[in-house]
Amino acid sequence: MKLQIKPPNTFDEFVGKQEIISQIQLSIKASKLNKTQLDHILLYGPPGVGKTTLARLIANELKTKLQIIQGGHLQKPSDFLNAISLIKKGDVLFIDEIHAVAPNVMELMYPVMDVFKIQVLIGKDFNSKIVEMKVNPFTLIGATTQLGKIINPLEDRFGVILNINYYSNAEIEKMVSIYGKQMKLELNSNEISAITEHSKQTPRIAIRIVRRIFEQKIVNKKIDLEGLFKNLMIYKNGLQSIDVQYLEVLNRQNEPQGIKSISSMLGIDRHTIENKIEPFLLRENMIQKTKKGRIITNSGREYLVNF
């Protein structure tokens, strides 16, 4: 039998974020009692914290189909028209990284979200006319790592807006314990704590580490976390080699650095730096953003000495 990590299929199986789960369940129950379509939901937060999983669980709870599309794939009105043409009554449409949807497509979404209707231009030149088309009622769930890029008219059309942030150590430890048992790994409390410490309080990273431990045990017949973390270049607090390189770049400079300079020195695009590297370093107070640029803090310098 092939062993694999099984994602939660119900809200009861979802670990952590109980206040958020309760709010979602309340909205679902109210929509069922009122026999109305569940309000559109916007989920925002860092990568890997379960936004897609929550969308899937909502669809499961509604006993309906989940349609998934990336925001970056909605760049023309026809892209959105194709997406909603596949929707059946009561479906859930999940748009991941919804901030990447083209502005003109966002505007097209407004009447669809409001009244499930869309105006389409048919024909060309003098023979063209605007036709209003009905869309099957559905729930739109948007997910984003960059809430600030969601324009206000679009954000205002979401009835439920939830911040899915990092998890507590206790929540990550519980996940690691569950995933370890699913993979037939006999992890002791110290090993579970070590995995948690190296996960950046992010479920996706914790799952990734558990999978690598499973591979290590299959090949080497034993678990060696210290060796595994060294091979994966995952350091104290879960920082990876690119995070350390970022800190080292700032540490070598005597003045604040702009994002373009950092991008050039690291050879990494701005989007990756701002969305993958900086959020956790800011949260851990290892760097600061000032009007003049990014600077390393004393905590960041201490980390470089001790990691």
UniProtKB/Swiss-Prot annotation:
| SUBUNIT field | Homohexamer. Forms an RuvA(8)-RuvB(12)-Holliday junction (HJ) complex. HJ DNA is sandwiched between 2 RuvA tetramers; dsDNA enters through RuvA and exits via RuvB. An RuvB hexamer assembles on each DNA strand where it exits the tetramer. Each RuvB hexamer is contacted by two RuvA subunits (via domain III) on 2 adjacent RuvB subunits; this complex drives branch migration. In the full resolvosome a probable DNA-RuvA(4)-RuvB(12)-RuvC(2) complex forms which resolves the HJ.
Q: Where are the transmembrane segments?
A: none
One annotated Gene Ontology cellular component of this protein? Holliday junction resolvase complex
Protein origin, superkingdom: Bacteria
Task: Enumerate the residues binding Mg(2+).
Answer: T52
Q: Which reaction does it catalyse?
A: ATP + H2O = ADP + phosphate + H(+)
Region span, Head domain (RuvB-H): 236-307
Record PANTHER family: HOLLIDAY JUNCTION BRANCH MIGRATION COMPLEX SUBUNIT RUVB, PTHR42848
Alphabetically sorted, this entry's keywords are: ATP-binding, Cytoplasm, DNA damage, DNA recombination, DNA repair, DNA-binding, Hydrolase, Nucleotide-binding
User: Is Lyase set as a keyword in this record?
Assistant: no
The record's EC number reads: 3.6.4.-
List the Pfam families: RuvB_C, RuvB_N
Record-annotated residues binding DNA? R270, K289, R294
Record-given protein name: Holliday junction branch migration complex subunit RuvB
S-S bonds: none
GO BP term (any one): DNA recombination
Q: What class of enzyme is it?
A: hydrolase
